[in-house]
A protein has these predicted regions:
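C-terminal nucleotide
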Residues: 1-198, 212-268
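Conserved phosphate/anionic-ligand binding catalytic regions in large, soluble enzymes, centered on
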Residues: 199-209
Length: 268
């Protein structure tokens, strides 16, 4: 995203994308804002920890504000040494604010005023379970690798490979980025059982929708199975407070690749 780059890639013609709503609302205000903003802040903290370790090891001069700034091509060290530095900077255990301050050579107050306060209206409260910097780093780097692999899968028309990458992406969103919910996980699992090639949550998580890559000839069966297993069985049994109504088209719809925004000159 820095800078933003785009590239046109075609979906295989024999697959469709099914969008299924989990029926869990994902608010973007008040307490939920802490969770939404926590992840990018933890990513910036991970970048700062890596940069600090690089400066100690090789006098790395470049400014680092985000994980994308930790460009291996700019680091004058062998790949294995870079891996060791990152492993040293990002320990598996969650970090407290005091531990982060010590590693970065900063005061806790300084971190609260800067990294934990990305805007005048928001300050992240130190999470009770600690800052999960290694897990967030692993997710972001893994997603970047999956994007590159997805590009190659689309170029070769390999829908099955694309589906496997979607599955891996959801697992990372769940386990490392921590933005899934039991309902999203269930909907993804049931989507796979119903015939999708790959399924994942979409958007910022904590509710909302899932996307499923479905063979075109399987769309009708997929929709019937997911309607029955998730909307008519799982939700009434586990979350009866989430009303779905009686119309599958209100919570599931089929889509596919189409031409994007463009300019049409109507004057000859």
């Amino acid at each position: 995203f820095f800078p933003l780059r785009t590239r046109a890639l075609a979906l295989p013609p024999d697959v469709r994308v099914m969008i299924c709503h989990s029926c869990v609302r994902a608010p973007k205000s008040e307490a939920a804002m802490q969770e939404y903003n926590r992840r990018p802040i933890e990513c910036r903290l991970a970048a700062a920890l890596i940069a600090a370790e690089l400066r100690r090891r090789c006098a790395f001069p470049a400014a680092v504000e985000r994980l994308a700034d930790v460009d291996r091509s700019r680091i004058p060290l062998p790949a294995a040494e870079i891996d060791r530095i990152i492993a040293s900077a990002l320990t598996p255990a969650a970090q407290t604010l005091a531990q982060l301050a010590q590693k970065l050579g900063r005061s806790e107050a300084s971190l609260l005023e800067t990294e934990l306060s990305p805007s005048p209206r928001f300050r992240l409260q130190p999470p009770a379970d600690g800052f999960q910097v290694q897990r967030r780093y692993r997710h972001v780097v893994g997603e970047a690798e999956r994007v590159e692999k997805a590009t190659r899968a689309l170029e070769s028309g390999d829908a099955a490979a694309l589906g496997r990458l979607m599955d891996a992406s959801h697992a990372s969103c769940r386990d490392d980025y921590g933005i899934s919910t039991p309902e999203l996980d269930e909907l993804v699992a049931l989507g796979r059982e119903a015939g999708s090639l790959g399924s994942r949550l979409t958007g910022a998580g904590f509710g909302g929708c899932t996307v499923h890559l479905v063979p075109a000839e399987q769309v009708k069966v997929f929709k019937e199975r997911v309607w029955r297993s998730y909307y008519r069985t799982y939700l009434p049994g586990r979350r009866p407070d989430l009303a779905t109504g009686d119309d599958p088209d209100k919570v599931m719809f089929e889509t596919g690749a189409a031409a994007g925004a463009g300019f049409i000159d109507l004057i000859e």
